Structure formats: structure tokens, C-alpha cells
Amino acid sequence: MAPSTKATAAKKAVVKGTNGKKALKVRTSASFRLPKTLKLARSPKYATKAVPHYNRLDSYKVIEQPITSETAMKKVEDGNTLVFKVSLKANKYQIKKAVKELYEVDVLSVNTLVRPNGTKKAYVRLTADFDALDIANRIGYI
């Protein structure tokens, strides 16, 4: 009788399958979060751009021209500050770098404002080592 019970047990196992019943996980949240999976670093076969673009805003495009109004001259004489009309797209870091590159001076700070006519003005304060009046003479706007 033993072999038949073994056979019936085997038959039941085949009918049931080997997977058995899986306990269902109770969801307590309405949102389903994907598990964090391995994300490998990219190693492209070729660059997206064949040739990088040339510098769109070099020093000569950043600083357009010095401003020579009376108030600007007062800033040059009293405040050790140079006043320039600059590109609308230039930021303070680019203005500082351009002044340093073009006029070989150290810049203490840069203040900018966009004028009502749509141009940008920059007040470039120089360090105590440099005299704004001498630099303005060297540039040629005094």
C-alpha cells in the first residue's frame, strides 16, 4: 500500500505545481515607489557634439564701451570705480574677468544695473593697488 500512497502524493504535487501559494503583501500606501536599481556611468562611443562651440561672449564682447558722463567721471575720481556699458548677457563674474584681462587690473567688486533703455551698466571698483584715474587715462576716455 505504501507505493500507491507515494504515487498519489506525487500526483497531487504535479497537479498543485512546485510554486505553491505566495502570501500577498498588504499595501498600506496608495503610491508605488520603484526600487533603486544599479545605474552604470555612461561611456559614449562618440561625443554628442563633434566640435565644441566657440566662446560666444569673449572679453571684447563683454565690455562694449566706457561711459564718460559727469557722474561716471565723479565715480572714477572719488570712488576708484570705472563705469562701462556691458553686454546684456554678461554676468558679474564675466565682467570682472574681462576687466582683469583687458586692462591688467585687480577688481574689488562689480555692481550692475539694467538701464531703462535696455542696456546694462557696470560699476567696476578697483583694488587700492590701482588708481582708476590712471587706468581711465590709459584706456583713453579722459
Curated annotation (Swiss-Prot):
Family the entry assigns: Belongs to the universal ribosomal protein uL23 family.
Species per Swiss-Prot/TrEMBL record: Kluyveromyces lactis (strain ATCC 8585 / CBS 2359 / DSM 70799 / NBRC 1267 / NRRL Y-1140 / WM37)
Keyword rRNA-binding attached: yes
UniProt keyword Cytoplasm present: no
One term of GO molecular function: rRNA binding
Descriptive protein name: Large ribosomal subunit protein uL23
GO biological process, one term: translation
Membrane-spanning residues: none
Keywords noted in UniProt: Ribonucleoprotein, Ribosomal protein, RNA-binding, rRNA-binding
Listed PANTHER family: 60S RIBOSOMAL PROTEIN L23A (PTHR11620)
Top-rank lineage group of the source organism: Eukaryota
Stored HAMAP family: Ribosomal_uL23_A (MF_01369_A)
Gene name of the record: RPL25
GO CC annotation, single: ribosome
